[in-house]
């Protein structure tokens, strides 16, 4: 059941991911209300699918595809999407997002296996289970 829900969440996350990356930008975007907020958005756009992919499958190729999609998306934005620009720092934020998604998936897997998130030890080896 959890895999089915994760699959639907992944599909939704990928739709948001693709729309956010490839919709044309505004010809006059105006001033940044929050400086560098776009970098946080890039991190989240790549971390969310990476996390969900890891929750669904142990295959490595979808994560490689996510990582490869980062520079491709920046090139497409730079060359093909009106009023968008490719940016090296966006690419860095995309890579950070993939790594963050992998890390969060690893923490979730440890938690699901009954390990302590702090030490990676199973409960009962000198640690009390939280109440």
Regions found by a protein language model. Give the residues of each.
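Membrane-interfacial alpha-helical segments at the cytosolic side of multi-pass membrane proteins
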Residues: 44-60, 98-108
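Hydrophobic, lipid-facing residues on alpha-helical transmembrane segments of integral membrane proteins
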Residues: 48, 64-72, 92-103
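Membrane-interface helix-loop junctions in multi-pass transporters/channels
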Residues: 32, 61, 116-120
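Membrane-embedded catalytic cores of phosphoryl/pyrophosphoryl-handling enzymes
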Residues: 54-78
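Terminal transmembrane helix and immediately flanking juxtamembrane interfaces
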Residues: 1-25, 88-131
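"…centered on the first transmembrane helix and the immediately adjacent amphipathic helix/loop
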Residues: 1-54, 66
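Interfacial helix-loop-helix junctions of multi-pass membrane proteins
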Residues: 27-35, 73-98
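Membrane-helix interface segments
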Residues: 4-5, 57-63, 87-88
């Amino acid at each position: 059941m959890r895999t089915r829900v994760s699959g639907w969440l992944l599909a939704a996350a990928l739709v948001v991911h693709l729309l956010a990356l490839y919709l044309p930008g505004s010809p006059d975007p105006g001033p940044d209300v929050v400086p560098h907020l776009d970098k946080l958005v890039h991190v989240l756009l790549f971390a969310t699918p990476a996390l969900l992919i890891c929750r669904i499958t142990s295959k490595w190729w979808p994560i490689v595809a996510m990582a490869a999609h980062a520079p491709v998306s920046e090139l497409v934005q730079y060359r093909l999407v009106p009023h968008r620009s490719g940016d090296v720092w966006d690419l860095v934020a995309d890579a950070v997002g993939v790594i963050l998604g992998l890390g969060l998936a690893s923490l979730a897997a440890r938690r699901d296996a009954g390990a302590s998130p702090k030490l990676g030890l199973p409960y009962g080896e000198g640690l009390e289970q939280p109440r």
